[in-house]
Amino acid sequence: MIYSKRLILVVGPTGTKKSYLANMLAKKLNVPIISADAYQVYKELNAGVNKPSEKTLSEIKYHFISNISIFDEWSIAHFNKRAKEILEQAPDWTIVCGGSHLYVNSLINDYQLEKQELDTDLFDALDKLDNQEIFNQLCEYDFQEAIKIGKNNRKRLLRALYLFKKYGKKAKNDSKKFDYVVVKCMSDKEKLFPYLSKRLDEMIHDLNWTKEIEYLDKIITDKKLDKELIAMKALGYKEIYDAWKNNQPIDKEIINKKFKRLVKHQLTWTRNKFNDGMKQFTFNFFEDDANRTCDEIIEYIKSNHD
């Protein structure tokens, strides 16, 4: 099936102001935003996941922000199915914004996750790998998704890697299912890393991250559930939790190192993927004017796809 709806993908590493640009573009075009973020969907997570503000949510129609509890199941298949249902009712253009690239990839390449026939040769070959080997390979495709799943959840690791190996690169005669314009939000690491370090300080001190961790610990304990919930694997949450539980100072250097590792993977992914859309734009928050970038995108859309 080829869909008539068109997408504006706003992708890039964490900290490159994807949401800032997407929000501005959504207001100018009066279109909704589908959040392709692995953690913003959980209503209990706030301080560490950079959700849109209440003011922004009152001005822009967002999907997959605070939709479910950390105790609910959420996966690529859930996102894929729900996003397609939303797009059936959406206007001609919809923005998809987020750093969980497997989510974005599953949508534009129309993964049929519920109906797929198993490629037994590929699955059997991957099943011979140990958990660390599967984890390492998945990191090359989507570092954030690999971290979210964790090294010990073999079933989910294997499924995610299988999806990438099977569907991540389309066959030469396969056509994309959604037409899309892509905006790649990029920045030099030399400018991005200091910014991320400063943002981490703000998340810890201004947004009461530790207080949120204390609340999460209480509700998880009350339900007598394992602390190893998928939602709690969002970047920084384990480190903040361990520091709080052991009454120790937060080791910001460890969290910063994980941010840097994530960014390096996301930079490589963003450069190499989403290159077969109708038009590609780039946005560097440190150098480019967001208004001008939005106007260029809108001019292209109006002049080519009325």
Swiss-Prot record:
<comment type="subunit">
    <text>Monomer.</text>
</comment>
<dbReference type="InterPro" id="IPR027417">
    <property type="entry name" value="P-loop_NTPase"/>
</dbReference>
<dbReference type="Pfam" id="PF01715">
    <property type="entry name" value="IPPT"/>
</dbReference>
<comment type="function">
    <text>Catalyzes the transfer of a dimethylallyl group onto the adenine at position 37 in tRNAs that read codons beginning with uridine, leading to the formation of N6-(dimethylallyl)adenosine (i(6)A).</text>
</comment>
<keyword id="KW-0819">tRNA processing</keyword>
<keyword id="KW-0460">Magnesium</keyword>
<comment type="similarity">
    <text>Belongs to the IPP transferase family.</text>
</comment>
<dbReference type="InterPro" id="IPR008144">
    <property type="entry name" value="Guanylate_kin-like_dom"/>
</dbReference>
<feature type="site" description="Interaction with substrate tRNA">
    <location>
        <position position="100"/>
    </location>
</feature>
<dbReference type="GO" id="GO:0005524">
    <property type="term" value="F:ATP binding"/>
</dbReference>
<dbReference type="GO" id="GO:0052381">
    <property type="term" value="F:tRNA dimethylallyltransferase activity"/>
</dbReference>
<dbReference type="InterPro" id="IPR039657">
    <property type="entry name" value="Dimethylallyltransferase"/>
</dbReference>
<dbReference type="GO" id="GO:0006400">
    <property type="term" value="P:tRNA modification"/>
</dbReference>
<keyword id="KW-0808">Transferase</keyword>
<feature type="binding site">
    <location>
        <begin position="12"/>
        <end position="19"/>
    </location>
    <ligand>
        <name>ATP</name>
    </ligand>
</feature>
<keyword id="KW-0067">ATP-binding</keyword>
<protein>
    <recommendedName>
        <fullName>tRNA dimethylallyltransferase</fullName>
        <ecNumber>2.5.1.75</ecNumber>
    </recommendedName>
</protein>
<keyword id="KW-0547">Nucleotide-binding</keyword>
<dbReference type="InterPro" id="IPR018022">
    <property type="entry name" value="IPT"/>
</dbReference>
